[in-house]
Amino acid sequence: MIEYRKDYFSDARTDGLTEVGVTRQRSDVLGHVTGKTQYYADRHFAGLLHLKMVRSPHHHARIKSIDVSRALKVPGVVRVLTAKDVPQNIYTILCLIQVEPNDEPVLAFDKVRFKGEQIVAVLAESEQAALAGVAKVKVVYEELPAVFDVEEALKPGAPLVNEYHGRNWFTYEGHHCRRVRFGNVDEGFAAADHVIEEMYQSSPIEHAPTETTGCIVVPDQNERYTCYSNTQALYFTLDNSALILNSPFHKLRLVGGTVGGGFGGKVDVITEPIAFLAAMLTRRPVKYEYSRAEEMQVSSPRAAERIYIKDGVAKDGRILARQVRLYVDAGAYSRHSPYGTTKAAAHMPGPYTIPNVWVDCHCVYTNRTPSSAMRGFGVTIGDFALEVQMDKLARLIGMDPMEFRILNAYRDGDMKAHQKEVDGAALVECVQAASDLANWPIAGRYRAMSSQKREG
Amino acid sequence: MTKKRGRGMASVNYPTGMNLGGDPSQALIHATTTGSFIVTLSSVDLGQGLKTVMAQICAETLGVSTENVIIDTADTDTGPHCMGTFASRGTHRIGNAIIMAAKEAKSVLLEVAAEELEVDAGDLETDGAGNIRVKGSPQKSIAILNVALAAHFKHGRTISGRGIFLQPRSYPEPETGKMTPATCYAHACTVAEVEVDTETGEVQVLSLKSAYEVGRALNPRMVEQQIIGGAWMGLSHALYETTEPYYPNRAHGPTDFNQYLMPGPGDLPEFSNVIIERPAGDGPFGAKGVGEMTANSPIPAIANAIFDAVGVRVDSLPITPEKVLRGIQALAHDPEKWTPVFRKDHAQTEDAARH
């Protein structure tokens, strides 16, 4: 059931639109429901090679030696790729927006920093032969102590996860975390009737697309290479691949646009650079596709977060101060997590006007699968923590949870903690509409409030 | 066995776009000889319906029907740059680029039509049905098909347009965090109703009732599709999903959908939704990005409803039956105690050892 509440903001909308504001059937839906949509994997190329990865069985280990000789003897195995074959082996995805340092190898060579990290690519005439080749690659490891807890990782003496950072956290312009400072939280806590501090925690979450991440790269004429990919961002993939391959940009072409579920999981650039490289070195089409197990345990999940929220609230329901310490578990490499951590900081203290806000958001490296973008990146888990905290605060002071939200909700013209004036607010109206929809009564004072005026 | 019901709510907002790195997207539009309009992009449709909404935005701006617009996308040899489909940016950023391109194409279209009709271009309008007519005297009109033919074969004009939307990069101030991380914000509020089995700790979500403020719903059924799909994901995050069930312990990671749990059709609640539209000044026809937000408010609403039902706070995701049951048992021992169930040392050792 869906209903439009046209009574809200009725003077803000222009009429006379004919093509937007009306339902049109999705252009791809018939193909999807009849199974006729062509995804990248539906393309077939003569001479296709299959790429399978040798992956780390350890969370953290030094690589003592890699022996591929027995793999090369497996019938159907055409060649193997190691770090030595990758022109610019160390990269980071967000170097395109000047995020530093490059901190991740395309293929691991001196160390592995998480279980499942890719080390050797095996190219073969069939998937079966490629997997048989993978089983024959001998890697000798020396296991190293690993760290899995974000707060343990920040302590002195913790195992160092990523040497390119030199410490277990991302550095933001000289700071060990992304900070937000607005007002004075100590004064806010002193003036509050109640102060509570609570801790929230999430675990990594998989995007779980129907179609796993993958691509096929095909050598064209004229030394160009076309990559058929299910990436969510063609140019991100093209530009990063060219940098990793040390290739002129014009030699690479990305074709995509039909994706069997993204949710942020196909924003990383993992399968394409190595498939490009394999196609360049073999002059044959190459397919690199994650298995379901790789999709779940090797491809980046949503970051686990640990969030401490300390609030000072007055008896009348106003939140006077909010202090947030947030830890994003980036896993072994940056990928998109430094960005998501900043996004998390900007999101605090939620859609409420609080005069005193103090936020420290830490992007922390641990020996687990690198986390990266996922739907609601930097916000979803923060909202879980904030809104459970809001429920606790409302109950603590004996206020209705809806009225408590409406009282504190930001209004047009208010100043946010990241010093941006609120514009186009509509939280008050959403809470009011939800109270109607769910038959959850609120008092007349709160019914009369709006996002444009604090009181009615 | 007792089943207890509870109700909880949560309200959230969500930013459109990701301009902490600069946030551009481009569109090119041209008319064919027969008056169809091709929009060329390199943007990716993830299955959310981007291509359909982009065609609608182009059609509305040009004043033609959506059927006459063809979206040609996702080839870097032909399509101009797009940052990508993420950060709830597609509708807003690419939509704005298309409006800019369509305005330029439309101005050429009207200029050619003006020559054909021997009137001033400023006096012309599209009728939305494939014709261009003189304002106030609709009998004086010309089919867009004929305008396009004339442009190609008689006037030597390209009916085309270029569009870009760029939200310039914001650099956060290191000391204070002063920044402009996004553009407009969408809003939501969800009320969840749950039933908790006090013997097994299992939670059944009975209903999710939500209000969403989306700026402008450009395609109402696709908005509905987004918000129900998103609410499903929120429910799934709240109660089921993780790749590391005993985080931060790395053991017992699922590798397939037998082990990685998600709600099935029988676990779906009743969905009721209300849409509110407060158009964004910078959005295409006022639209805001809502793709990501729709998963967010159900999660805390469900957590709060569980507390309302059985008095147990589970402050760690996912809220599994095991955690709920432990909370219920702890409460039975000490009803005065208000205890978050999660303890990291506990999760790391005892729970993992038990399995």
Language-model features, listed with the residues they occupy:
Chain B
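C-terminal catalytic domains of large/alpha subunits in multi-subunit enzymes
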Residues: 1-14, 56-331
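Conserved beta-alpha junction segments in alpha/beta enzyme cores
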Residues: 8-33, 41, 48, 184
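Short, aliphatic-rich beta-strand segments
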Residues: 36-41, 205-207
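Conserved strand-to-helix beginnings and helix N-cap segments that scaffold or border functional pockets
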Residues: 51-52
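Short linear segments in intrinsically disordered or otherwise low-structure-confidence regions
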Residues: 334, 347-348
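Short, intrinsically disordered C-terminal tails of secreted or membrane-associated proteins
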Residues: 351-354
